[in-house]
Amino acid sequence: MQCSIKQILSDATDKLNKIGISSPQLEARILLQHVINKPIEYLLINLDEQLNEAKIEAFEKLLARRLKHEPIVYITGVKEFYSREFIVNKHVLIPRSDTEVLVDVVFQCHSRESGNPEKKQPNPCFRGNDISENCNDKFLNILELGTGSGCIAISLLCELPNANVIATDISLDAIDIIKSNAAKYEVTDRIQIIHSNWFENIETQKFDFIVSNPPYIAHSEKSEMAIETINYEPSIALFAEKDGLQAYFLIAENAKQFLKPNGKIILEIGFKQEEAVTQIFLDHGYNIESVYKDLQGHSRVILFSPINLNRSYARRIGKSLSGVQKNLLDNKLPKYLFSKEKLVNEKRKVFLEIGFGMGEHFINQAKMNPNALFIGIEVYLNGVANVLKLAGEQNITNFLLFPNNLDLILNEIPSNSLDGIYILFPDPWIKNKQKKKRIFNKERLKLLQDKLKDNGNLVFASDIENYFYEAIELIQQNGNFEIINKNDYLKPHDNYVITKYHQKAIKANRTPKFMILRHVLGDH
């Protein structure tokens, strides 16, 4: 029995249409071209050609599979991704065009860091030579977690000849597929494929990029999904615990030890997950560098970088960090590390303390004002650890810490955003040639004034009399401030606690003085 191409396609289109296939005619053509191994164009110009019984029977078998809602790419065994055709089967997630945004972001980051920053947003249309020709020869190490078919890893290798990739997957069946795809595109010498549950079997080494399209669908969303996806794609690549967020928690908790100092994490997310995923990474001490949208305008890929704890500013006076202190800095500090993203949409009053020492005043202010947010700056890591200890003991959480130099944070704080600033007993830098190092100087006063809201308060305290009165003179000459307590500099501000430093000053016959300022309306 023979039948024409036209009749075969017509009958198949009708059957596919009846079960709700969105593009029945196209899918009928794809199945038939797969059987006869000819391009679709051949079918269209040879509609009257008669096919023999063997080919008709082969076509009917494939059509029967599609009529059961098996994805057409599993039937044909291939799927295009980033202008290349990848081998796929039921053991790997079907590559989606949305995931191409992730590949674009890697290329853009590499291009920017290589000295070609002209592309500000990933362009879904640029491919291949557009990137490799613009990038320098910097050697790249990339880790992909949960590689599946390998479409991400292999696309990166094909476009970046100076890259090596380690690709992991928990499924041995998936690993067979990525090996086939790596061989197909001749990149086996630059890819190491590891059977691993996330980071478990990865030797300690450092990567420029960690990338992943992890499972991110909540189990509660199954009822909303297509039959093709639910019944045929591997559930381990689709669904995750913790409302679909489990993988993001795991990556946030473990990735830092595998990143180079300027390394990046680039992750695909569900289109409703931007807020939840960014919060996970903020809580674990990462910067949110950029969020990228897919062609439908949904947030699809996020670029993260770790907030590196720069300990070079720490003053090791007396003794080095204890084991308890190191544990606090390593395990508790990331949650409370300052980043500008944490101030976005902040509705509470916000106060900044510069140089909080051992943190007695800082913690007391946070305790007495639980509905406000306190940001603390301190380069002395023993003091940072002590704040974390005191906060844990008193269940205080309304604070952020920046264990680094003041000048590195000022540009991160928005103008007109602070309700108050505390500068208590800063280093006076007595010698004339050192005075430019003072926290309270003309240049910084201008910056601090810009950050304060109108009517916001700035409190300055010092036990060095010359410094204190020089500060008053500085205010009178350069600041848009009103001195509230000009008749009584000995009286501290509200909720002040006498710190150990204050006590030492009194024992040394030095008198602590306080200047309480109100920022008056002026130009920012």
From Swiss-Prot:
Under the heading PROSITE patterns, the entry gives: SAM_MT_TRMB
**Region annotation (HemK) ranges:** 1-306
What are the start and end residues of every segment in region (tRNA MTase)? 311-524
The record's listing under HAMAP family reads: RF_methyltr_PrmC, tRNA_methyltr_TrmB
Q: What name does UniProt use for this protein?
A: Bifunctional methyltransferase
Q: What does this protein do?
A: Methylates the class 1 translation termination release factors RF1/PrfA and RF2/PrfB on the glutamine residue of the universally conserved GGQ motif. Catalyzes the formation of N(7)-methylguanine at position 46 (m7G46) in tRNA.
Residue numbers annotated as active site: D427
Q: Give the Enzyme Commission number.
A: 2.1.1.297, 2.1.1.33
What is catalyzed by this enzyme?
Answer: L-glutaminyl-[peptide chain release factor] + S-adenosyl-L-methionine = N(5)-methyl-L-glutaminyl-[peptide chain release factor] + S-adenosyl-L-homocysteine + H(+); guanosine(46) in tRNA + S-adenosyl-L-methionine = N(7)-methylguanosine(46) in tRNA + S-adenosyl-L-homocysteine
Region RF MTase, residue ranges: 1-308
Enumerate the residues binding S-adenosyl-L-methionine: G146, T147, G148, S149, G150, D169, W198, N213, E353, E378, N405, D427
Q: Which domain of life is it from?
A: Bacteria
Q: Which family does it belong to?
A: In the C-terminal section; belongs to the class I-like SAM-binding methyltransferase superfamily. TrmB family.
Name the gene behind this protein. Answer: prmC/trmB
